[in-house]
């Protein structure tokens, strides 16, 4: 057999292996979702470990933790642009692969890379220009601004690498190479876990060391992603000819990615308004408590996010292939797993909040405030499952308008106004700020889910 024939046979066997119209839907989803969950959990955990180390720094640990917590909404907004390209382009690739148009799928991937490069350079420059006033606006005090600025100075220097790794990894996962996608994150995470204590404590770099460890780790992850997508093992490959922006593709990528982008940005906006309100009503102590709570939230939400994102290539591929019955089977499976998980997490956080808080900081005053705040914040957490289910279906099937609307509805339309209004009702004060989250979980989650059932489910 000739080399060309051998290559074609190998390519066909790889493609057949990743044909999601065959086999069990639940098996296909789990096969993709588990590595993605592990990868994203590791990714979140190594960011959380940064905060754990900083929270236990001798002397100024609480202030360092709070300062970095104030900076994280900015980082989340920057990373949302990576998601805009990755979460917008990768599902489109799955749909086009399902239709058999791999050429268009590769053009989508190439255009997504170009968009990432443009956004990365622009946001780095803008970040250096506006970071100090923005950090004050986001809840920094004169005591914590030093730590927030120090972290951002280093982080922005390597921001482009972070965006490339985060934005292009979904294109590995969307082709069915879930383990390779997981390795992207694991490589960076392990390196970060090694460098964190060395830079923070060994070299005595403090918050700058935490940022440097993150940037170096993400650089290695970005190189790994780009090498794989340019190599022979990938089904869809990066090609220089596909980097030229095409207006129609850019429009499709941004339209579909706008849902995840909006969700990330509005999450950050809620955190920003929450931090600013907590600073007003309670000071640095409450902002520090919320830094811990948002860190915990990142960890416990990630399995839901990873699982639903892992289902997207499978649902999108089958939808593109016209297999609507299999799509409904997949949605049922996602619903069952996601709701069960959310209820379990809620029970643990309600019963053992103190043990969780001590992982970050054991200071008595902070512990007391954080335990009460955590119970308020997660009081109705399990309703978040309905938001993830509905949002996942909208994105998987290319329903960009609905996906964007419900991202905005839960946080921008409900969350931010409630944070501003509830503290003034019945003199709730600080508890009004904390109570906004459970209210938005119920209303936003149920509205998204039942709209999906009416507009999408009935038509499948």
Feature map (PLM): residue ranges:
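Small-residue-rich hydrophobic transmembrane alpha-helices
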Residues: 65-125, 162-181, 275, 289-353, ...
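Short runs within selected transmembrane alpha-helices of multi-pass transporters and secretion channels
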Residues: 86, 155-173, 181-189, 210-223, ...
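Short alpha-helical transmembrane segments in multi-pass integral membrane proteins
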Residues: 1-33, 93-160, 202-257, 315-380, ...
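Transmembrane helical elements of multi-pass membrane transporters/channels
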Residues: 31-50, 154, 165, 188, ...
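Helix-terminus/linker motif at the lipid-water interface of multi-pass membrane proteins
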Residues: 41, 45-66, 135-142, 198-205, ...
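Transmembrane alpha-helix boundary and packing residues in multipass membrane permease domains
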Residues: 36, 40, 52, 91, ...
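N-terminal transmembrane alpha-helices
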Residues: 20-52, 56-60, 73-88, 92, ...
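Small-residue hotspots at the loop-to-helix junctions and early N-terminal turns
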Residues: 62-73, 152, 211, 284-299, ...
């Amino acid at each position: 057999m000739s080399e060309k024939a051998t290559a074609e046979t190998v390519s066909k066997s790889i493609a057949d292996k990743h044909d999601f119209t065959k086999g069990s839907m639940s098996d296909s989803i789990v096969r993709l979702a588990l590595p993605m969950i592990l990868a994203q959990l590791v990714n979140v955990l190594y960011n959380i470990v940064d905060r754990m180390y900083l929270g236990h720094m001798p002397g100024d640990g609480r202030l360092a933790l709070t300062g970095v917590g104030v900076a994280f909404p900015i980082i989340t907004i920057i990373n949302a642009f990576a998601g805009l390209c990755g979460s917008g382009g990768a599902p489109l690739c799955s749909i086009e692969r399902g239709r058999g148009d791999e050429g268009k799928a590769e053009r989508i991937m190439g255009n997504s890379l170009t968009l990432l490069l443009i956004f990365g350079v622009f946001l780095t420059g803008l970040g250096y220009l506006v970071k100090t006033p923005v950090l004050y606006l986001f809840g920094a005090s004169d005591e914590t601004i030093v730590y927030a600025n120090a972290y951002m100075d280093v982080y922005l220097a390597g921001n482009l690498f972070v965006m490339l790794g985060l934005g292009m990894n979904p294109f590995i996962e969307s082709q069915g190479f879930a383990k390779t996608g997981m390795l992207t994150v694991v490589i960076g995470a392990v390196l970060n876990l090694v460098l964190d204590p060395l830079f923070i404590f060994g070299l005595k770099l403090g918050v700058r060391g935490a940022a440097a460890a993150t940037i170096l780790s993400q650089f290695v992850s970005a190189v790994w992603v780009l090498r794989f997508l340019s190599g022979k093992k990938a089904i869809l490959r990066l090609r220089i000819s596909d980097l030229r922006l095409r207006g129609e593709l850019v429009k499709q990528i941004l339209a579909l990615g706008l849902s995840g982008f909006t969700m990330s940005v509005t999450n950050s906006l809620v955190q920003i308004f929450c931090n600013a309100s907590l600073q007003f009503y309670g000071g640095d102590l409450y902002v520090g408590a919320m830094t811990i709570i948002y860190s915990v939230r990142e960890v416990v939400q990630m399995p839901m996010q990873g699982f639903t994102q892992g289902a997207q290539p499978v649902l999108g591929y089958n939808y593109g292939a016209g297999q609507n019955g299999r799509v409904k089977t997949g949605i049922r499976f996602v619903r069952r797993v996601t709701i069960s998980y959310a209820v379990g997490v809620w029970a643990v956080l309600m019963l053992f909040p103190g043990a969780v808080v001590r992982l970050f900081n054991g200071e008595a005053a902070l512990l007391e405030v954080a335990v009460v705040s955590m119970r308020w914040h997660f009081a109705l957490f399990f309703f978040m499952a309905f938001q993830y289910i509905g949002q996942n279906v909208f994105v998987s099937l290319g329903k960009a308008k609905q996906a964007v609307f419900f991202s905005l509805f839960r946080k921008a339309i409900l969350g931010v106004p409630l944070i501003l209004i509830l503290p003034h009702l019945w003199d709730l004060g600080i508890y009004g700020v904390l109570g906004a989250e459970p209210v938005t979980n119920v209303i936003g989650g149920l509205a998204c889910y039942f709209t999906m059932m009416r507009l999408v489910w009935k038509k499948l």
